[in-house]
């Protein structure tokens, strides 16, 4: 997503929009990343152990394997993440779950042209089944 379209001095939340179907399984760990230009200070990557049913209501995270990198151009939230909340299912059957937030100070997030968000599971070679991802939604949120 091009960061030029983001409002300055605004906090945003990223949501994954998805559906699950019969026999949904195989999603034990995911990584969530906000990636900027090539140096470690220009990116933030969090690793979350979400259990096999990570899209279920109120699942606890284990933060022991978390890695964070910060940029001086953007401020990322550092509050402890205690649970993932599944939002209400929309009229169209799609659900949305928040998986991260960031603050765009201005002049483009992280001094780059794009923001990249990923949901990945590469550590476990188990078959994945039953998850349909519509996309990632970026929404402005109220300041804490």
From Swiss-Prot:
GO molecular function, one term: carbohydrate binding
Pfam families per the UniProt record, alphabetical: PP2 (PF14299)
Domain of life where this protein originates: Eukaryota
Cystines in this chain: none
This protein's name: Putative protein PHLOEM PROTEIN 2-LIKE B4
Native source species: Arabidopsis thaliana
């Amino acid at each position: 997503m091009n960061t030029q379209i983001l409002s300055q001095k605004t906090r945003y939340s990223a949501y994954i929009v998805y559906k699950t179907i019969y026999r949904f399984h195989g999603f034990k760990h995911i990584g969530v990343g906000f990636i900027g230009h090539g140096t470690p200070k220009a990116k933030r990557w969090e690793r979350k152990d979400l259990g096999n049913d990570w899209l279920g209501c109120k699942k606890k995270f284990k933060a022991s394997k978390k890695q964070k990198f910060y940029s001086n151009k953007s401020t990322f939230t550092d509050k402890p993440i205690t649970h993932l909340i599944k939002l209400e299912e929309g009229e169209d059957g799609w659900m949305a779950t928040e998986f991260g937030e960031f603050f765009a100070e201005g002049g483009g997030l992280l001094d780059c042209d794009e923001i990249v968000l990923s949901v990945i599971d590469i550590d476990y070679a188990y078959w994945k089944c039953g998850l349909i991802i519509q996309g990632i939604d970026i929404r402005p949120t109220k300041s804490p």
